[in-house]
Every structure is written in structure tokens, then in C-alpha cells.
Amino acid sequence: MTARYIAIDWGSTNLRAWLYQGDHCLDSRQSEAGVTRLNGKSPAAVLAEVTTDWREENTPVVMAGMVGSNVGWKVAPYLSVPARFSSIGEQLTSVGDNILIIPGLCVSHDDNHNVMRGEETQLIGARTLAPSSLYVMPGTHCKWVQADSQQINDFRTVMSGELHHLLLNHSLIGAGLPPQENAADAFAAGLERGLNAPAVLPQLFEVRASHVLGTLPREQVSEFLSGLLIGAEVASMRDYVAHQHAITLVAGTSLTARYQQAFQAMGCDVTAVAGDTAFQAGIRSIAHAVAN
């Protein structure tokens, strides 16, 4: 009989769970009980609630994300990069009876200190779905990952997503703005500025000045700022992209479209994989191996 197992993406603010029989998803559930929102409950109690009537005898549970961080259930030690893809699923941390956490990855060099949790599971899936030498994983903190067919060799992090949120919501740039609207032209204009002048710090106040002076519609500041930051990010990582024969984007639909536009402007072809699809493929491969 094909093995039954539970796969969980447990982040800071949300928890998503899937019940599988082999490669077939039998059920899925979602909770707002991220590791920073447990409301006094233990992680074990939350897991028991979410997986009620799912676990039969010793059904394996494999978890990824911030659940393995120092604010989660238990620290799942980072694996140092370079790291073989196969080693990720071989060094799981146990927190209970057949309940396991996938390790994160880290880099610690004189010129590069970085960590990731959750993205390593997406990488395992993306490697199967769209093999590449460079994986770009947009989000709050965009990961740029160099890899070959066997191992992850290096990665960097660019905080464009968080910077956009902070500037728009907690700085003078976004103060007093009306509700923002989608505006492809404003995004494209910001993208061009960022690609052509990636030293973005001197340009940030100009975003405010532009809407104060009326040259940028106040409802389109978010779109222009998004383009500016993504353009600057992609341009500043130009050396990381150089000589890469294949680039895979791993993200949701909206961010994929924005980064595709940036790469196309640089003359780079990319393949896109949905972030959720990559994550589920990655965690299934690990959980399936554990269950069998």
C-alpha cells in the first residue's frame, strides 16, 4: 500500500498542511497559528488540532519553515552551503513521534552571511520541475541561489519586498497617500529607472518629490516604487546572473510577472515555477522518502 504522510509549511504567521497518500493529496487545511501567533498554545497542541483525524498510528509529519527557527518549535540546525540537495532530507530534526523538521541553509563567508528557512524545500521541488543554475525566489526577502544538478553552491538575499513595505507604510514616501492602484506604466517607469541606476538610495526621496510636485500620480507611488526597487535589485545582481545558462523564477503569479519583466529588459530568458507548486513538490519528495 502507498504510504500516507502529512506535509506542513509552518511560517511566522500561517500554517498550511496537506495529507497525502503517495503523490495524491487527500485533504488540506490552513491555520493562522503561525509560530509567532500561537496564543499561548504549544506547537504540539496546534499540530494536533490541525491534523485532527489525519494521523493513523505512526503517520509521518514533515515540516518546513520558521517552525525550525529559534522562535519556532525547535531549532533545526542550518546546513552549511555548499550542500547537496540529497543531504537536506537526510538531516531532519525530530520533535516527536515521527514528527520531523527540515533544516534551513546558511552561508558564512567574509563577504557573505546568509540564511534561509523554507526556501530550501522550494529549491528541492524547483530542481525537479525546472532544473537551473540560478534560482531567483522573490518575496519579502528575495533569495538568489546558485546551484548545479547535485548541490546548492551559494546564495544571497535582497530585501526588496520588505523595503517596499517599510518605505510605503512607515516612511515619508508613503505618508498621506490615498489607496494605491495597479498601474503598469508606473511600474515600467520605475523599473527602467532602477535598471539604469541601481544605486537606489539617492533616488528614494525623489519618489516622494515626484508625487508632491505632481509628476507621479499619488495613487501610483506603490507601483513606481516597486519597479524602482526590483529594477535596482536585478541590476545590482547582474554579476550573479552573468554566464548563467538557465534562470528559474520561483514565486507567486504577481511577483513572477514583475521579475520576468525585469529580466526581459536585461535580455535574459527565464522559466517560472509557482512557489506553492515547488514547495509541495519538495516537501513531498522528503516526506515520501521518510514514509517509505
Task: Tell where the protein language model's regions lie, with residue ranges.
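Glycine-rich phosphate-binding loops at beta-strand->alpha-helix junctions
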Residues: 14, 244-262
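Short glycine-rich, Thr/Ser-proximal phosphate-binding strand/loop in the N-terminal lobe
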Residues: 5-42, 273
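Glycine-rich phosphate-binding/hydrolytic loop that grips phosphoryl groups
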Residues: 235, 268-292
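Short glycine-aspartate micro-motif
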Residues: 5-9, 60-62, 133-137, 248
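Adenine-nucleotide phosphate-binding core of ATP-dependent small-molecule kinases
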Residues: 193-234
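Short beta-strand-loop/turn "lid" adjacent to the catalytic site in phosphate-handling enzymes
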Residues: 54-113, 149
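N-terminal phosphate-binding loop and adjacent alpha-helix
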Residues: 24-60, 68-75, 175-176
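Glycine-rich phosphate-binding loop plus the immediately following alpha-helix
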Residues: 38, 106-193, 197
